Amino acid sequence: MLGSTHGTFTTDLRARVVACGEQPDRTVVHGVAAVEGDTDVSGRPLHAPVPDLDRFFRPEVVAVVGASDTEGRPNTGITRQLLDWAGRVGARVVPVHPTRTAVFGIPCVPSVAGLDGSVDLAVLLVADPLPVIEELAASKVRFAVAFASGFAETGEAGARAQERLAAAVARSGLRLLGPNTNLNAFERFREDLEGPAVALITQSGHQGRPVFTLQELGVRLSHWAPTGNEADLETADFISYFAHRPEVGAIACYVEGLKDGRSFLLAADQAARNRVPVVAVKVGRTEAGARTAASHTGKLTGADRVVDAAMRQFGVIRVDGLDQLQDTAALLARARPPVADGVVVYSISGGTGAHFSDLATAAGLSLPTLSEAKQDELHQWIPDYLSVANPVDNGGHPVGDWRGRKIIDAILDDPAVGVLICPITGPFPPMSDRLAQDLVDAAERTDKLICVVWGSPVGTEEAYRTTLLGSSRVATFRTFGNCIGAVKAYLDHHRFTTGYRSPFDEAPRTPSPSLRKARALMRPGHRLSEHAAKQLLRAYGIRVPREQLVTSAAAAVRAAGLVGYPVVMKASGPRLAHKTELGLVKVGLTSASQIRDAYRELTDIARYEGIDLDGVLVCQMVGRGVEMVVGVTHDALFGPTVTVGLGGVLVEVLNDAAVRVPPFGEHEARAMLGELRGRALLDGVRGAPPADVDALVEVVLRVQRMALELDGDLAELDINPLMVLPRGQGAVALDALAVCREGAAS
């Protein structure tokens, strides 16, 4: 707990840490006992069971409802693909058709009622899956897939139809994929590829196709879950399941909208505990993208700033393009944990090395200068006039003979080096073929990551197609940008998971004594006055200035004597949001006459503007510091969110803020400050003393507790400015705005 005497609860969200290098057991949620009904103080779940989807992906018996072998009908092509897939996974197919005796020579049953209870998976090739779902429940079928469209993606009527379908599924006890999905779960997965696999989750089948083609580049794929509208099974279910599969090295997701924010975070938490990378394209960065995504699946896209922060908070690697999704997931799936974060660029061309180094440094990668001893060693094989400090320029000729392997081994032998990147911008077989083979051979002998960027636009060269893509130990890229992004994600994810502490482990489960005081202040559907909002802050141990609310000039003079000169006077009322712009704040008042004049002027302005006041605040003047803003808003997907940023009258102009989704701990609160462009102001600039960052962090954590406990009551909170005083002097909320939700619990 941070050292404060304010408040009645701890802000410490300690969690158990997996020892560095320890490999979590993927058969259970690592470190978590899933407890039925275990919720945080806001009523949201803290644990989610891992769904058992083994019989979905590897069923023994598959029923195809609406199977057909009549040429020209859509169901015929689907039935044919299902038969092919079933043959490869060893499943028996039972066609269901009311009038046919056989389909493709396989005996039919006339209805779902005729199934014998051994069916694991039912594929529904029918326009309306609802009546079939109800029949499947009686036959004890465990899983179903509904391809039909016309549900939430079509508007209100479709959304109501999907609600009825979801309710029927919930009653039945089976699990449903879809509706509005496709055949991607039943694709042909190659069994001849080595190494850990990429598991794929998409809400659009076409968008997953580029990642599926990783198999043509030598990368193994294990599963594809096309979730569609997610009436039942959702993206989070598949993340949880894949995070516990031993063959899965990384999870690649294409997400248009999320069904439930908390379930997504719980799934991402399980992946982080098990150190399984999750890489995601999340549509909706722009208004047009969000609108299109919502209409495609009928799900909320969420405020993009919040989605971005939530993903980063739980280690989900967000990328923008499908090519980035493909390359990043492939690298993360197959790379061993880094032994160091130093990156060396090794190239045939000095220009290529310089260009790549600029891009890598700009991305935040560490390119250490090799030691003098290491440079002397490299100059045994590389001419002295070439630079080998990093990047290492070999000039071309050494790679064509025995020296090439010596150079690579010497670089990898440096303990500061964890990644070697070799950009080969164009094929020149006497050099590039030998270089590619030397890199592949070196990758088999080292635990360090070796990456190659093959720059030829042709892509049919033997060194590329056979040598590089034939190796599961070398990460091969086609562009500089994708290589740099993937390597950064690789190093960042390792750092994240090595120090990961799940915030769910120590999230508050029971209300603090502050809640009773706070609820007494709530006014459902109304904005609180500044005075009432500050009382709310005081209930949670957040320091506010000494102040009194008065309704006469004489009372204001008496209050100033009690508060202590100099004072600030402010109009107070529930409809006041921007007092400064209206001239409703007077500062630096030092005498009774100034107090009386200020009172008269404030009330006159309010009367002229038609603003109802509950009085005038006479407030203690607080010393100078760094003005910050700390606030709470409610996101449709994730619930309460906490924001911290640079504050004051220019808060909207500066737009320098970081956001998090509760629960989070002290480490995450400090990370929020590190994201601010103006972070240096807290360290002291131009002679100003360093600010009390510890006090600021504690305010953020106390506001988070308030946001969780008052989730059903508080729609919005804005502390602006929060004056962060010099180190050791604390932080004071000089102004506050609070808006109560309609139908609040109070």
Predicted regions and their residues:
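Catalytic-core regions of core metabolic enzymes
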Residues: 17-20, 27-746
